[in-house]
Amino acid sequence: KIAARATPDAFIIDKGPYCDDCGECVSVCPTDAINLKEQPRMETIEVGAIILALGFKVYDSDGLEELGHGRYPNVVEAMQYERLASRSGPTEGMITRPSDGKQPSSIAWLQCIGSRDQDNPFCSSICCMYATKEAILAKQRLGKDVDCSVFIMDERAFNKEYSAYFTKARDQHEIEYNYCRVSEIREDPQSGDLLVQFATPGGELHQEKFEMVVLATGLQPPESARYLADNLGIELNQYGFCKTDKFTPLQTTREGVYVCGAFSAPK
């Protein structure tokens, strides 16, 4: 197996750099299941229904030059932060700055990156919650003294328990929420720290320094959505996700073809 937790739970022949095409695997296979001369072929099968689970594509923030991702090493996207926080990640779960390996004493999360703007007017629905989770995780890993600030337009908690999670983050973990949208990030070239510029609720321009910034990137339709829609004869909505009805959220515009997960809408 290439991956221990692969799905489906099956073995494959990995013709990587260590395979010399000796063919010994054919002779030792007890069920004669290996045919090294097998060629790809097209098959037609009849099914009663089709379920589309294409998932989503994460927004690429490199095009937003004012936020510095790709230029400033300590500006990371949420997926990169998740890898740093993962016990199986490159830092074994220890959250460190990419520039110098130092544990940050202050982290800012910027919300709605690639969502609720002129290009992508829809809400990605998950960013508020995962940013709050990541901020709490920073407190747990780095200590309660680390400064965690979330720059957010408004709280979008799409669940009864989610509102309580926000309250817990604010009251118990002392996560700070700033209701604004960041206009620019600049780097201090000596320290690698980041200067975050934003407007206060009173309209005053303010600047605050953080040692690390996390961009809460939104969700976009998968790249294969249009190709699949054309081949299956289904419609997409104005944002490029699968078109459904509010009262039948699993049904596409073609009978017998259903959709699940984030392909129907960001979730």
What is each residue range found by the language model?
Residues 1-267:
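Residues forming the flavin
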